[in-house]
Amino acid sequence: MDQSSRYANLNLKEKDLIAGGRHVLCAYIVKPKAGFGDFLQTAAHFAAESSTGTNVEVSTTDDFTRGVDALVYEIDESKELMKIAYPVELFDRNVIDGRAMIASFLTLTIGNNQGMGDVEYAKMYDFYVPPAYLKLFDGPSTTIKDLWRVLGRPVVDGGFIVGTIIKPKLGLRPQPFANACFDFWLGGDFIKNDEPQGNQVFAPFKETVRAVNEAMRRAQDATGQAKLFSFNITADDHYEMLARGEYILETFGENADHIAFLVDGYVAGPAAVTTARRAFPKQYLHYHRAGHGAVTSPQSKRGYTAFVLSKMARLQGASGIHTGTMGFGKMEGEAADRAMAFMITEDSADGPYFHQEWLGMNPTTPIISGGMNALRMPGFFTNLGHSNLIMTAGGGAFGHLDGGAAGAKSLRQAEQCWKLGADPVQFAKEHHEFARAFESFSHDADKLFPGWRGQLGLAA
């Protein structure tokens, strides 16, 4: 059935929709399936299925219903581009406080339309949230400024937080795990649980929490510097998340503000993120996106992009989210990921299709991880343009020939090298841990800095 007469209006202008302030706008790349309708017909069916319609006309539709139809307002078949305007009235709101929810946004904009028989593929690349609706989202309650404050740094441009993920990600018992934490903290700032770590039979949660607490206290005494840890509290059960969080805060006592809470936001979903955001508003909310590649990967033509995921995370209240390495690490990514970092940190930013004003909503910190080491960092910082972020290097720290503490120091020295605008090989001559990173990650060194061995006086 051709629904374009109802669910499409190509005379609508985007600037007028934005000025009106009552529509969420979404941009998709879409391809109709062969043998069905043309591009506009498929787009209109997509809008119908995403809002007030179905595959047939129904007798219960009235004039009010038609007033909240989602409308296709722009198409470009040559680019497979479709833009849809969703009236904000369509989206569910909390009974308890009238706040907005990402679960409803996803259900409409990327829900049943992903399984439509006449759509070969459809993927969301950007979305725009109008001011009145944006204000209904929680947004972050804490930011990187809170971590800088704990670390004793300036709360403006406090700089690089040197972090790690204890490796191996699974298989360490509580005390060896805590020992690795202590080792890294002798040179670094921040440690996170890897996303599967929790309450395994060989590493009971409470025993691990107590051991890490002791390691943090010893490291702080040894260095005279504050240390940070991000504990995974992800669970299927809301009450399990609360129990984990409360036990951690009770155990760490006066060091509670040194603790972030990690939530596997993609696999556990918006409900888990919001549980952590609302139950523990004083803690830094660390959004891990494990599993997101199933829909965000450039190889996937369905779902939504990592850019969209990160923008949703800011709305939900993530203090920080993993944003990839812009092609500098081992995970999928590209230099264009820079736009993602700007979208979640700035108060006014351009996405692939829409400009977004955040109206003072707290920023979300980019958390960089996945195959990074000290040699890759100067180029990464140059591409991003600043170093106000958290990086969690697992192999990049513990793969250092001299151990985790030296690995952490090499990462910090990499930032110093970039800030000075120094040549990395020349800088290495006067910074031992950074120099040893060349030997530790020689494959990267050969690729990034040909001839480094001779310059550092090492045999080829």
Swiss-Prot record:
Superkingdom of the source species: Bacteria
Active site: residue positions: 167, 288
Cofactors, names only: Mg(2+)
PROSITE patterns, A to Z: RUBISCO_LARGE
Sequence positions bearing N6-carboxylysine: 192
Cofactor note: Binds 1 Mg(2+) ion per subunit.
GO molecular function, one term: magnesium ion binding
Protein residues bound to substrate: 112, 169, 289, 322, 369
Catalyzed chemical reaction(s): 2 (2R)-3-phosphoglycerate + 2 H(+) = D-ribulose 1,5-bisphosphate + CO2 + H2O; D-ribulose 1,5-bisphosphate + O2 = 2-phosphoglycolate + (2R)-3-phosphoglycerate + 2 H(+)
Site (Transition state stabilizer): 330
Enzyme class: lyase
EC number: 4.1.1.39
SUPFAM superfamilies (alphabetical): RuBisCo, C-terminal domain, RuBisCO, large subunit, small (N-terminal) domain
Positions of Mg(2+) binding: 192, 194-195
UniProt KW keywords: Calvin cycle, Carbon dioxide fixation, Lyase, Magnesium, Metal-binding, Monooxygenase, Oxidoreductase, Photosynthesis
The keyword Iron-sulfur appears for this protein: no
Function: RuBisCO catalyzes two reactions: the carboxylation of D-ribulose 1,5-bisphosphate, the primary event in carbon dioxide fixation, as well as the oxidative fragmentation of the pentose substrate. Both reactions occur simultaneously and in competition at the same active site.
Family: Belongs to the RuBisCO large chain family. Type II subfamily.
Assembly description: Homodimer.
Name of protein: Ribulose bisphosphate carboxylase
Biological classification of the source: Bacteria, Pseudomonadati, Pseudomonadota, Alphaproteobacteria, Hyphomicrobiales
